């Protein structure tokens, strides 16, 4: 399946809903097409954009979304396409008595991006039960990568034997069993935690990556003495969240992020990375 569009406005599919036109937008289930695109260059793979800001008016780039959602469950293995949402993956696993995704399923992302960002929530991490990744490298070769070949970091992975620009199209996980009641309990725990601790606003979730010993919202609360920039506001109930506004220039959101980074750097001497990927 291929959906191919020229001069496409990404506000139709992006969380931020701002005007950003790319030269080509392609949704596909075809691995062969993706292989050819990679060999041509000039591409960007996206998921559901829950962690992306498109900060351009027009860009000559191919934006690719892999939408294949096949999943097979074997006795000891799960094989899943990277285009499947964590929500759907979690529901299928819960219904089959498989643990490892019942808390992660509350993250509004696709599997591929979640692996690339080594997503975690509470005590579950997407890489916990990971065994292999099936990828296409930058040269267009199909590769199988063992978990042991992956450097797992906070909110990112690094496959040292590969150049950047590879594409993850499948993941293989080991099966870990739990009872239906345990899975339901964990799922409800995650949902209730989000309701209680995270603001119910239109946002891209946490703006900044936490440090190993302190939460960024605590640093913002301590050192940042402003609350908004040209209409964009720091959420006062959780200061690592910024509310999205369709009626405002997205570049002013970026400027607010940069101002926060500057203040924190001047006070603690560290540059705080964003969880959000900003595409110029």
Short names for language-model regions:
Residues 112-126, 143, 175:
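Core subunits and conserved enzymes of cellular information-processing
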Residues 39, 46-48, 129, 202, ...:
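Short, basic and Ser/Thr-rich N-terminal targeting/leader segments
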Residues 52, 102-105, 118-125, 133, ...:
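A generic local secondary-structure boundary/capping motif
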Residues 1-117:
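Anion-binding (especially nucleotide phosphate/pyrophosphate-binding) glycine-rich loop
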Residues 136, 142-258, 262, 266-280:
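Phosphate/pyrophosphate- and phosphate-bearing ligand-binding catalytic cores of soluble enzymes
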Residues 70-72, 131-137:
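Short polybasic amphipathic segments
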Residues 21, 128, 166-168:
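A general secondary-structure signal for short beta-strands and their flanking turns/coil
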């Amino acid at each position: 399946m291929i959906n191919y569009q020229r001069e496409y406005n990404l506000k139709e599919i992006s969380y931020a809903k701002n005007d950003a036109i790319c030269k080509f937008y392609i949704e596909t289930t075809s691995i062969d097409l993706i292989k050819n695109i990679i060999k041509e260059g000039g591409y960007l793979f996206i998921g559901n954009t829950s962690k992306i800001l498109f900060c351009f008016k027009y860009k000559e780039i191919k934006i690719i979304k892999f939408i294949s959602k096949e999943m097979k469950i074997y006795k000891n293995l799960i094989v899943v396409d990277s285009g499947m949402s964590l929500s759907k993956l979690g529901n299928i696993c819960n219904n089959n008595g498989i643990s490892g995704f019942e808390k992660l399923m509350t993250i509004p992302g696709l599997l591929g991006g979640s692996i690339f960002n080594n997503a975690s929530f509470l005590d579950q991490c997407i890489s916990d039960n990971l065994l292999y990744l099936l990828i296409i490298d930058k040269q267009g070769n199909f590769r199988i990568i063992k978990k042991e070949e992956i450097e797992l970091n906070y909110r990112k992975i690094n496959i040292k034997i590969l150049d950047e620009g590879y594409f993850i199209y499948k993941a293989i996980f080991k099966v870990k069993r739990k009872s239906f009641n345990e899975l339901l309990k964990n799922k409800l725990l995650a949902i209730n935690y989000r309701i209680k601790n995270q603001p119910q606003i239109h946002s891209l979730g946490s703006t900044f990556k936490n440090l190993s010993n302190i939460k960024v919202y605590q640093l913002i609360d301590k050192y940042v003495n402003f609350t908004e920039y040209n209409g964009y506001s720091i959420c006062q109930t959780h200061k690592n969240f910024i509310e999205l506004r369709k009626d405002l220039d997205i570049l002013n959101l970026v400027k607010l992020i940069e101002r926060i980074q500057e203040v924190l750097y001047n006070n603690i001497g560290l540059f705080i990375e964003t969880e959000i990927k900003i595409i110029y």
